[in-house]
Amino acid sequence: MAETYPEVLRVREDRTRQLYGERHNHCYTSPAYRERVRIINQKLAETFKNHPGVILWHISNEYRDECHCPLCQEAFRNWLRNKYKDIGSLNQAWWTTFWSHTYNSFNQVESPSSIGDHGLHGLNLDWKRFVTDQTIDFMCEEIHSLRDAGATQPVTTNFMNDYKGLNYYNMAKHIDYVSWDSYPAWNKEEEICTAYDTAMQHDLMRSMKQKPFLLMESCPSSPNWQTVSKLKKPGLLQSASLQAIAHGSDSVQYFQIRQSRGGFEKFHGAVIDHYGGS
């Protein structure tokens, strides 16, 4: 898709378009990307909507990050026009007279960039608000494509701790259940602090819809991406799982069931390891 539609690749804040690769490398604003996602989601819904094993739809995976491409710039300007109505109101709200950063039109506004303006607090805050709204708009299109195909099961998407790139409380309004991925860095000297922080994260997830949530991902042994990742002590996995349930989780799920043969997360912990053991 990236070869046929280069616009689907994200542009970094320094205005460099990313090469194909890694993940989370797609523009939520791109019409081409949205259309292909709609087609895939509808096909999935048409195929599995009546399957007795499908009780919930997991929308995308760990929405995150942002794109600064021309499509997103124009969408951001339209978002600002809708909020402020005229450029004078924007200048007043952002106090752009400081350092003579006054805008003459919305067309002059660019998202925060290390090679441009990144010191205006109002600009940074509104950009973050826009990123959340644009992500929600994309997510809702994903949900609508399922509904249009006749899928009636509830939907969720997995959050990541107190991730600061998106307003999870706003996103939670558009899904039926909140779910999240919990990967505490256990086995440190400050073990009680890790337990306190994990408890707070569970409470945050429950508070978003004022009802039980789902623990979508947890690791039965040790993740592969933490700086120091020790194996869990005997009984710790059970304690962490019970902690989630005690704070309102209706599930304890693992990533991954079987360790991958290759790729970035081949050494990520799993229920079944490379040797077939558990």
Where are these regions (language model features)?
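Polysaccharide-binding and catalytic clefts of secreted carbohydrate-active enzymes
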Residues: T4-Y177, D181-M200
